Amino acid sequence: MIETIFDLNGEKTMIENNKEELMRNICEKFIKKISKNIDDFDFFYEEKIIDFKLKLEEILNLSDKNTNKILITVKYKNNSNTNEEEFDSITLIYKKIKDEPKIKIFGKKFVKNNEKICNIIFKGDTYSLQEDFNMVDNYNIGDEIIIKLSGINSITNIDEMFFRTEFFSSPDIYKWNTKNITSMSNVFYGLSILSKLPDISNWDMSNVTNISGFFYECSSLKSLPDISKWNTQNIIDLSDIFWRCSSLEILPDISKWNLDSTKYMRNIFYECSSLKSLPNISKWSINNATNICNMFYGCLSLEKIPDISKWDISNVIDLSYLFWGCISLHEIPDISQWNISNVKSLRGMFCNCISITSVPDISNWNTYNVNNFSNMFYNCYSLITLPDISKWNTWNAMNMGFMFYNCSSLTFIADISNWSTGNIRFKKFMFKGCVNLLKQRIPNKFNDDL
């Protein structure tokens, strides 16, 4: 429990509670005008701020003259060594940000060379900044970004650092020492007005395990810094990294990225709708990947996908919407030898691939564990023929709805009368719109709502 005494105009109040409740109580007791709008609390740091080890001693001053900026000056002492040292004040800031009122706490302390402070101590409890606070969270305060991290060398997490920032000016980020950082998810999330990024090609990524959503929805970027030489050997999560970078016309050569440790690869190129080609990703080692769903989802301009025939997907469980909406793609790469024995979902895999006339020979796929075939070839209206899929094992299939919906050019399908339907719960509109497919080719048990 936190034990803190507040002295406001001679009136002393003791609060015992956890750190979040402590700050809420400050506002409820002394800042009543905004108490209903409090959402959360974050710590911000400047310059060479690393990790703090502090004791909250007393509130020295409180001012509520301006509801946009309420100052609570707090006196701190450094308990990391025997020489006590006063810290700069911490200021409590209230500011409406995109109709999401927040309470923010800004702390500032310039540390000496070789000084390392571990965490914050509120009397009675110790909290690790790296676990309990987003040390580098970032919001606009007026026209200023309250963050300057040059020289920081002990931060391990910069998740959502510039999350939806409207005003971005950090040209010196290429200097950052990132060797100790392990997580970089959503760093530039939602910077939709940003047309160019500073050069981050030399960032040390050797200890990073998570770069999911790194450029998420940077929808104005036409190109990226050269990230081809990033050390990605420890990356576990690569999901959403280029999610909805809809103006991106070319990617750096990421063909040599080491993805031996990567498990999560869903949505990598999701709605990169301006990309016409991809780097040669054929040699990516994805044998540890468990999810590659939506990887090329909505790549409307993509005319060709590199040879991915030798990808080892034996651990993948989800292939849903893999090529969804690749409307400019005339040929699906050869995926006939893929081991899909652990795959549970093929939902929408080729959905809206409106230009393909055939698919690779996937007749020998082991589909025993697949429970969802729905929308698999949905709206592939140029598709003329299919491989012999009569031997597919559908014992565990639960959903086949819309599987061949609107395959209006399809003239032949192998006899699938032996497909098991014992566990199927939904199979409506399976062949709806297949106007050129002779009705007698479709077994009665799949004839629903033709």
Question: Residues of each region from the PLM?
Answer:
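Short structural boundary motif marking the start of a folded domain
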Residues: 1-4, 88
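Negatively charged
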Residues: 66-450
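Short loop-to-beta-strand transition segments
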Residues: 28-54
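Eukaryotic mixed-charge, acidic/polar low-complexity intrinsically disordered regions
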Residues: 48-73
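Short, contiguous acidic and Ser/Thr-rich linear segments
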Residues: 6-28, 50-54
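A short, sequence-level motif marking secondary-structure junctions
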Residues: 16-22, 54-60, 76, 131-136, ...
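Compositionally biased low-complexity segments enriched in polar/charged residues
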Residues: 5-6, 40
